[in-house]
Amino acid sequence: MKTMTQMRKPHVLLHSTKTMQAVAPRLQTDTSIDGGPYVQRGSTQNFVVSYEGSLGADGQTFADAVLAVCEQDYTFLQSVFGNISIQGLPFQVYLRLGDSNNGGAYHYSCDATALYCFITPGEPTELASMLVVAEEDEVFMANQNVGWNCGYSNGEGLSRVLATELHPSALNGFASAASWLDSNRPDWVDNTEQTDTDYVSIGCATLFLNYLRYQLGMNWSNIVQAGGDTLAQTYSNLTGASDAFSPFATLLQSRFPQGTPSGLQNDNPFPIG
């Protein structure tokens, strides 16, 4: 009798103009390290940070930038996720050499604490920290287990807004809101798309989460701890109301009329009005 071989698809933070040609699904049993050889630059209580030797001095610079803030960022995530315990620590951060075909970050399961971040020399050093947070917070989601799925649009949206909250200047190339505003604006609030690579559904998610935070005035801790299988469920958990999408879409229509290019270069146009 043949045994089905199970594969793990990487969960990714995809750059808007780059692919990940160097990344592919792997066997469930494969625990090897992608890329390398690596140079370990340093460690903290919850992180070990290494860079590909091919990055040279740039690798040291980016690794040092991560080491300088990673514990501070971890403390923020611990707070908003309700001080839950995280399994599999420390995080192993691997900074890989990026190029025009490889950008963003990934890990091989939502709870995987080996985090890979593509870095291209010349990019802002804060980018590395933003990428780490975007993958790290997905591990928090998996350990929390209240509905945020790192491979679905709701979890990918949360991943991005929390990373941007901590590192707003590093969003360039990862902003997704305009992709939804400039589309036919499907309802990815009442529905969740089962992918983390569609910029339209991700854009809807980042907009809605920022709407909760910066239009309705809810704090990140309450939002994160009110997770559900859809963003509408999160809204209902927070407010007791069921009409999540319509007021949100109507408000955005007032600022960004559908059919007209939005021109929005970040994920947070709020507050509006």
Predicted segments with their positions:
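Stable alpha-helical elements in mature extracytoplasmic
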Residues: 62, 66-73, 128-136, 154-158, ...
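Solvent-exposed loop and beta-edge segments used for protein-protein assembly and interaction
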Residues: 43, 201-203
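Zn2+-dependent metallopeptidase catalytic core
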Residues: 1-136, 140-150
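Structured segments of extracytoplasmic/periplasmic soluble domains
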Residues: 69-84, 139-143, 162-165, 169, ...
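Post-HExxH zinc-binding segment in Zn-dependent metallohydrolases
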Residues: 73, 149-199, 210, 217
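Secretory-pathway/luminal and periplasmic proteins that interact with or process carbohydrate-rich
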Residues: 100-104, 166-172, 232-234
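Short, solvent-exposed aromatic-acidic interface loops
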Residues: 97-99, 225-231
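Beta/coil-rich, acidic/histidine-enriched accessory regions frequently appended to metallopeptidases
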Residues: 24, 229-273
